[in-house]
Amino acid sequence: CKFSNYLKKLNLKKGDRVAAYVPNKIETIISFLACAKNGIIWSSCSPDFGAQGVVDRFKQIEPKVLITSDYYFYNGKKINILDKVDEVIKQIPSIEKVIVYNYYKKEKENLKNFIDFEETLKIETDESFERFEFNHPIYILFSSGTTGKPKCITHGTGNVLIEHNKEFMLHCDIRDNEKLFYYTTTGWMMWNWLVGGLATGSSIFLFDGAPVYPKIDICLL
């Protein structure tokens, strides 16, 4: 609720778009749910994407805010993506503000030109909720880009909620006392599917990294 209130302070309104160039971590879930609470349309790419791949997607939707991270992890390595973020910002003129997750708390100098996500949580909480239409867009996904630039695919909130609940509760038999894991990144629609599991009351497990590091069965532990 604090982050959703911060988005209001940035004058983001229902129907505005927020683009997220982010790893699969708890801050990403918070950001997505805050957007949904405010009727803001979410769209995400994973940080392993190159800058041009991100631009090809996000430039189409004209986001006002970009949410990103200073680093992500893969194969035991921390990988800085802020140079790619700078390139994305240069090519998408609609971006007015950039909010960054600070993975390494001692490296605050990385964030001097951006808004530190932790600072956004120092605002007061707003627990009020507004009702939106059944088919109000909740997020924009993209086609693979194999036949030209990726194409936008908009999903309605009510449709997504019903479909995901059907799949989790009837097809997968997920209940509110269970834990749900699916290896994915934020650039794949399965991340959106995984987050939908929260509607069942289950707990979801997030994993940022390679599925075979440090050993082949890491995701089975």
Region spans (language model):
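Short hydrophobic alpha-helical segments of the AMP-binding
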Residues: 31-36, 85, 196-198
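Short hydrophobic/charged patches on amphipathic alpha-helices used for structural packing
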Residues: 4, 55, 86, 129, ...
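Conserved AMP-binding/adenylation subdomain of ANL enzymes
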Residues: 161-179, 188-221
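ATP-dependent adenylate-forming carboxylate-activation enzymes
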Residues: 22-23, 43-59, 72-73, 77-81, ...
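Conserved AMP-binding/adenylate-forming
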Residues: 4-55, 179-184
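ANL superfamily adenylate-forming
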Residues: 68-134
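Generic beta-strand/beta-sheet core signal
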Residues: 21, 45, 69, 101, ...
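Conserved pre-ATP/AMP-binding loop-to-beta segment of ANL
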Residues: 99-100, 112-142, 149, 157-164, ...
